[in-house]
C-alpha cells in the first residue's frame, strides 16, 4: 500500500501544470501532496516516514536533479505524511470537534489577512517580471477567497449531517490535515526554504500562494476524503 502512495505522488508531481490566472503566469497546480496526506491517514508513522522519503528521493531521480537533495524540501515531504498520521493517532473525537471550530476561525483569519495583504500591494514580482495588481484583480481575488470559504463551510455542514460517526471522524481528519499542511508547509516552510536557498524574500511569493490555497484547500479536502474512504472500503 505504501508503494502505491509513492507511485501516485510521483505521477501527480510529473503532471503538475502552470495555470495562467488573472494575467499571472505562475499559478502552479500540483496534487502530489494528496497521496502523502492519505498515506498519513492510513499508515503508521514509521511507514509514513518511508513513503515520504521514497517519494522525495525518487522524485529527484526522475527529475534528473543533480547534487545532494535539499533537506528542507525532504522535511516538507515528511511533514506532509506525518502531520495527518499524528492527528489520526493522538486526537480524540472531542478534540476533533474543538479543532474543527479552530480550523474555521483560522480560515477566517487567514482569509482576512490574505485580503488585507492583497489590498495593500500594487505590484508583484513573478519570475523576475513585475505585474500590476489592479483594483479589478484585487476585487476578483476577494470574491474567490469569499467563495472558497463559503464552499468549504457548506461542504463541512453538508457532510456533517450526512455521514456516520466513523466517516465523520475521517472527514474531520481530512479537513484538519489539508488545512494544517497548507498553512505550515505551503505558506511558511516552502517560502522560508526558498529564501535560504535562493535569497527570494519570504513574502515575495505569498501573493501566488494565497491564490493557490484558495483552490487547493477545498479541492484537497474533497480528494483526500474521497480517496481515504475508497481505501478504507478496500482494506475492510
Which ranges hold each PLM region?
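Loop-helix junctions at membrane interfaces
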Residues: 1-236
Amino acid at each position: 500500500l505504501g508503494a502505491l502512495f509513492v507511485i501516485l505522488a510521483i505521477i501527480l508531481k510529473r503532471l503538475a501544470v502552470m495555470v495562467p490566472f488573472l494575467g499571472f503566469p505562475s499559478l502552479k497546480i500540483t496534487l502530489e501532496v494528496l497521496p502523502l496526506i492519505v498515506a498519513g491517514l492510513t499508515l503508521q508513522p514509521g511507514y509514513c516516514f518511508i513513503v515520504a522519503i521514497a517519494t522525495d528521493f525518487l522524485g529527484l531521480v526522475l527529475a534528473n536533479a543533480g547534487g545532494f537533495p535539499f533537506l528542507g524540501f525532504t522535511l516538507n515531504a515528511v511533514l506532509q505524511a506525518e502531520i495527518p498520521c499524528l492527528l489520526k493517532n493522538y486526537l480524540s473525537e472531542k478534540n476533533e470537534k474543538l479543532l474543527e471550530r479552530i480550523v474555521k476561525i483560522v480560515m477566517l483569519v487567514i482569509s482576512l489577512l490574505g485580503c488585507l495583504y492583497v489590498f495593500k500591494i500594487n505590484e508583484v514580482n513573478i519570475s523576475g517580471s513585475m505585474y500590476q495588481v489592479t483594483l479589478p484583480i484585487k476585487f476578483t481575488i476577494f470574491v474567490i477567497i469569499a467563495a472558497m470559504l463559503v464552499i468549504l463551510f457548506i461542504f463541512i455542514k453538508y457532510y456533517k449531517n450526512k455521514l456516520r460517526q466513523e466517516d465523520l471522524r475521517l472527514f474531520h481528519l481530512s479537513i484538519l490535515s489539508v488545512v494544517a499542511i497548507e498553512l505550515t508547509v505551503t505558506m511558511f516552510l516552502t517560502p522560508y526554504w526558498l529564501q535560504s536557498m535562493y535569497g527570494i524574500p519570504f513574502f515575495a511569493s505569498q501573493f501566488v500562494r494565497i491564490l493557490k490555497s484558495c483552490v487547493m484547500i477545498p479541492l484537497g479536502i474533497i480528494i483526500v476524503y474521497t480517496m481515504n474512504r475508497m481505501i478504507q472500503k478496500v482494506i475492510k
